[in-house]
UniProtKB/Swiss-Prot annotation:
Stated name of the protein: Pantothenate synthetase
Organismal lineage: Bacteria, Pseudomonadati, Pseudomonadota, Betaproteobacteria, Nitrosomonadales
Primary location recorded for the protein, binned into one broad class: cytoplasm
Species this chain originates from: Methylobacillus flagellatus (strain ATCC 51484 / DSM 6875 / VKM B-1610 / KT)
One biological process term in Gene Ontology: pantothenate biosynthetic process
Record bears the keyword Nucleus: no
Length: 278
């Protein structure tokens, strides 16, 4: 089946009328194997797979890389065709925001921590565009990656608190053989930085091993790990051990945990996380 490219909301709604099993995979394009894994998960679960490609200006801060974000539509469409997607929704900014978007979704306070602390307003922009996409596509299933763990948590809350009839499917983080999490931003790394970038995942694995061997002094583990990366030239935004169910800082009563990190190699901000149990 040939991939359909649809840029207009009205045309997409007309095409989807009568479909009784729709999966949505929202992306900003510049697709890699991590995105394609999400499309394949969607393909297994739904009769009609819609991938959106939209570089959402609401989720970029004043000093972030909106204008420089790679736009690779032809290559993306070839990958989506091969992965079995049915439709790619490619709206313009004018199509998604014909007037100033004065109505916004305000996420819970957790959105101001972790990645939200360094990127104020980011998750407002994410939640708002995802709600718009949910309303436009009206999917039965939506697929998001676990690499953006905080985003996944906020979207699950969006669905729960607004009673949206959508099943959220979480795709496992896809990695290079070195352990580096696949990311569109990896393309910004030079060879030396890419070699060093492997260390982020290795550091998280060491934290998991440390905790599972009985060390429960989470603040000390976080501080030591941040100091270790800083001494190696990283600029660390955060390393944080949290409850994977509430995303609040982990207490000794929590058994399902996630360690999350964001740190920069040069100008490139990398994020990663590992879920684990104790």
């Amino acid at each position: 089946m040939t991939l359909q490219i649809i840029p207009e909301i009205s045309s997409l709604r007309a095409r989807l009328a009568g479909e009784n099993s729709i999966a949505l995979v929202p992306t900003m394009g510049n697709l890699h194997a991590g995105h394609i894994h999400l499309v394949e998960l969607a393909r297994q679960r739904a009769g009609c797979v819609v991938t959106s490609i939209f570089v959402n200006p609401l989720q970029f801060g004043a000093n972030e890389d909106l204008d420089n974000y790679p736009r690779t539509l032809a290559e993306d469409c070839a990958k989506l065709q091969a992965a079995g997607a049915d439709i790619v929704f490619t709206p313009s900014v004018q199509e998604m925001y014909p007037t100033t978007q004065t109505m916004r979704i305000t996420p819970p306070p957790i959105a101001n921590e972790l990645c939200g602390a360094a990127r104020p307003g980011h998750f407002d922009g994410v939640a708002t565009v995802v709600m718009k996409l949910f309303n436009i596509v009206q999917p039965h299933i939506a697929v998001f990656g676990k690499k953006d763990f905080q985003q996944l948590f906020i979207i699950r809350e969006l669905v729960r608190q607004f009673n949206l009839p959508i099943d959220i499917i979480a795709g496992e983080t896809q990695r290079e053989h070195t352990g580096l999490a696949l990311s569109s931003r990896n393309g910004y790394l030079n060879e030396g930085q890419k070699l060093e970038a492997q260390r982020l995942y290795r550091t998280l694995k060491l934290i998991v091993d440390n905790v599972q061997q009985g060390n429960r002094d989470y603040p000390a583990i976080e501080a030591q790990s941040s100091q270790y990366l800083t001494q190696l030239g990283w600029i660390v935004d955060y390393i944080s051990i949290r409850s994977s169910t509430t995303l609040l800082p982990a207490s000794l009563d929590d058994h399902n945990l996630v360690v999350l990190a964001a740190a920069r190699q040069g100008n490139t901000r990398l994020i990663d996380n590992i879920e684990f149990s104790v």
